[in-house]
Design a protein with these regions (language model features):
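Glycine-rich segments within core transmembrane alpha-helices of 12-TM secondary carriers
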Residues: 143, 163-192, 415-428
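Cytosolic juxtamembrane N-terminal segment immediately preceding the first transmembrane helix
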Residues: 1-49
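Intracellular juxtamembrane helix-capping segments at the cytosolic ends
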Residues: 144-158, 391-406
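Central cavity-lining transmembrane alpha-helices of secondary-active solute carriers
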Residues: 75-93, 318-331
Length: 468
């Protein structure tokens, strides 16, 4: 992708580069490209923190004083995904219009609103349901940003490094999911955060109430968000791309846009959907949400399965996103060497097998504590395998797109596919609520099989039309 002064006629100011050609090794500014990558990766991590902050809070809302039904909680956890999918359709067209600097800095500042709001509304747990829905929707800003940040970063790197650069940014950014889910249970119990506001009493089945400061799970991120916005405004540059909104929509006449969208729904749709619902699934299948296991709440709750140790979801939910994000980072360099299609194929086959295995753990056997514990282990390890293979696919599909499409279109396709896959938390939440857990997972197997066929026929087999 080459830009010329004519492409930047209307671009004035020190933030805009006069020309930029990452494919020309003699003029490519490697230092600027990597500086852009690391700053935007840090801010993208904060975006994922804000996006999945509700998923770390929602499973414990009833324990700190709210009284929502299971469907209400699933809808609440699904809403950030709905918002992210819709907002990604907006953010995908912003990079050529706003430029990297303004888009990244201003987007990062917007994260203050949902993060601050969730902190306030967990500090005093008396907000109406609609208000929490609004906050959940605003959290989707963090998810929407992905479709602007990733194409913008792709402008700075040559095609031969696209898999590594985008894999690092997306993978490290995805760590924001496990980061917020890991730190939340650890930070809320610290008395040192008394200055952040009043405490709450968290109820545990059959145990004494625990004093917590749940607002700390939100407030602790605000300084990092502000630092990210400052770094973006101070150090980022913008590549002048000659493409208006109408030009960007020419990607929809290319059939590979639609095939890659289907594949990315399998990979990132699964990663984001399960990241949002993992905690609730664990509670409702093997925890206090299952009336066949626990009756009542708090210290007076009655455990109906003698000897069963009810798992605390906050000890496990971060593992899935951590494994998925780690796989994305580790496999990105491999895709630069081998191409992405073969790994997308492996991802699809792996998802078929791991989803099938997990289905056996979706119907808890409450006949004994041993049977329940065995079912929980199968559920947990199956879910972690699903995260692993979705992470591999996230890396490989992002290698394929820059190989299949020319530079300007590749950015648009990355934004579009990311937008649709971001509906994962919404679709998973609604699908589980409407269909039930087991039928929804069966649909997941069917989808993965379809993706394996598409990948082999179109991208991976010898003589494939778009070998990638």
């Amino acid at each position: 992708m080459t830009t010329t002064p004519n492409a930047a006629t209307a671009r004035r100011g020190s933030e805009w580069l006069d020309s930029w050609d990452p494919e020309d090794e003699s003029t490519w500014d490697k230092r600027l490209a990597w500086q852009t990558l690391w700053i935007t990766t840090f801010t993208l991590t904060m975006c994922f923190v804000a996006w999945f902050l509700p998923s770390a809070i929602i499973p414990k809302l009833n324990a700190i004083g709210y009284s929502f039904s299971k469907p209400q909680l699933y809808w609440l956890a699904a809403t950030p995904g709905l918002a992210a999918g819709l907002l990604r359709l907006v953010w995908m067209v912003l990079p050529p219009i706003m430029g990297t600097r303004k888009m990244v800095a201003l987007t990062t500042l917007l994260l203050v609103f949902p993060v601050l709001g969730w902190g306030v509304r967990t500090m005093v747990p008396n907000a109406p349901y609609w208000e929490l829905l609004v906050l959940a929707f605003l959290a989707g800003i963090g998810g929407g940003a992905f479709s602007g940040f990733m194409p913008s970063t792709s402008y700075f790197f040559p095609k031969r490094m696209a898999g590594t650069a985008l894999g690092l940014q997306a993978g490290i950014g995805n760590f924001g999911v496990s980061l917020v889910q890991l730190i939340t249970p650890w930070i809320i119990g610290f008395g040192m955060f008394w200055w952040m506001g009043i405490s709450q009493q968290m109820k545990f089945p059959g145990k004494a109430d625990q004093q917590v400061w749940y607002q700390a799970a939100s407030f602790v991120w605000l300084p990092f968000i502000l630092i990210g916005a400052f770094l973006a405004w101070r150090y980022l540059k913008s590549v002048p791309i000659k493409a208006n909104i109408r030009q960007q929509f020419d990607i929809f006449s290319n059939q590979d846009t639609w095939w890659m969208t289907i594949l990315y729904i399998m990979t990132f749709g699964t990663f984001s959907g399960l990241s949002a619902q993992f905690g609730l699934l664990m509670i409702n299948l093997y925890g206090a949400g299952n009336a066949a296991i626990v009756q009542g709440s708090g210290a007076s709750a009655q455990l109906l399965v003698q000897g069963y140790d009810v798992p605390d979801p906050v000890k496990y939910v971060f593992l899935g996103p951590l494994i998925g994000a780690g796989a994305r980072v580790l496999f990105a360099p491999l895709t630069d060497r081998t191409g992405g299609a073969i790994w997308t194929l492996i991802s699809g086959v792996g998802l078929v097998g791991s989803i099938w295995w997990t289905i056996g753990g979706l119907t808890p056997d409450t006949s004994s504590a041993e049977a329940l514990a065995a079912g929980f282990d199968r559920f947990l390890y199956g879910m972690l395998l699903i995260f692993l293979f979705s992470g591999i696919g996230n890396a490989s599909t992002f290698k394929q797109m820059p190989m299949i499409f020319e530079k300007r279109q590749a950015g648009g396709v990355i934004g579009w596919t990311a937008a649709i896959a971001a509906f994962g938390p919404f679709l998973f939440g609604i699908g589980i609520t409407v269909m039930g857990v087991v039928p929804f997972y069966v649909v997941g197997i069917v989808w993965a099989v379809m993706c394996v066929v598409i990948t082999w026929v179109r991208y991976a087999r010898p003589g494939a039309p778009k070998k990638s």
